[in-house]
């Protein structure tokens, strides 16, 4: 399902410099290719992609970094060993345009979030 051109994802990406926007857009595109019936909303003040009405992830630009929020601390813990050298906290993965999150890790995050949402 295409996202709204004036929705929260497009609005956020429009204000991001081109280099960073390309990295964030790649994450959004991966979700759109993988997740059926993707939606969008604002959750915790972040533009958020949804699955079955629940937050699957947010990928945003901050002042000094890019960040991925999988809206689940257990997901970050599950992929932490594969993200050595990235700045991690309970619910956040910080990265940059120079060092994006590898696509296979994005795929794992998506799969883990979908599983958690499906299991309710």
Predicted feature residues:
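Charge-dense, helix-prone N-terminal extensions
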Residues: 1-120
